């Protein structure tokens, strides 16, 4: 995928683990992401990055680092998981962003790259996404990416049970 003027997406590499460990060790990231434990375990980023290859080979997930072209830093993760293939191919879009990079538009740019990757390289026809009701910034990103809002649903994540806003996009 061609980068935007500010960000590129690429597979994570082992050298990203220190930056990822720092970013996800912030309680605010764990709170809004919902699937990141807090406190984040020592060495957790290294283990998480090492798991990506098996998920990709199994066809269950596409996980990418979002890199700032301004400073070369890994600033976030974006993924499509719960992938299904075939006639009704679909997946679940998820992302988290390091706190220093919040409210700067990086999510929308990286999301556009991931949607292009899903449609062109993986022939996906539909993506779904969700965010906790107390995280409206994620909803704004999804709306800017052209996702349509569905009925809210109660869901459980690592932080507990919450009401989530749900979305879908036909690619």
Report residues per predicted region.
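Surface-exposed alpha-helical segments enriched in charged/polar residues
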Residues: 50-54, 116
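Short loop/turn motifs at secondary-structure junctions and domain boundaries
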Residues: 55-59
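Conserved GNAT-fold acetyl-CoA-binding loop/helix
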Residues: 30-51, 62-64
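Acyl-donor (CoA/ACP) binding surface of acyl/acetyltransferases
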Residues: 1-28, 63, 67-171
């Amino acid at each position: 995928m061609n980068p935007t003027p500010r960000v590129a997406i690429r597979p994570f590499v082992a050298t990203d683990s220190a930056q990822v460990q720092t970013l996800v060790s912030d309680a605010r990231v764990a709170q809004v992401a919902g699937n990141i434990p807090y406190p984040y375990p020592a060495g957790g980023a290294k283990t998480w990055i090492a798991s990506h290859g098996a998920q990709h080979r199994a066809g269950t997930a596409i996980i990418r680092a979002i890199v700032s072209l301004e400073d070369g830093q890994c600033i976030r993760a974006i993924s499509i998981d719960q992938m299904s293939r075939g006639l009704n191919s679909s997946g679940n879009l998820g992302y988290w962003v390091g706190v220093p990079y919040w409210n700067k538009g990086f999510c929308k740019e990286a999301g556009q790259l991931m949607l292009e990757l899903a449609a062109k390289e993986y022939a996906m026809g539909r993506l779904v996404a969700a965010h906790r009701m107390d995280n409206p910034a994620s909803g704004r990103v999804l709306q800017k990416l052209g996702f349509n809002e569905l009925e809210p649903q109660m869901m459980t994540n690592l932080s507990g049970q919450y009401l989530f806003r749900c979305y879908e996009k036909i690619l």
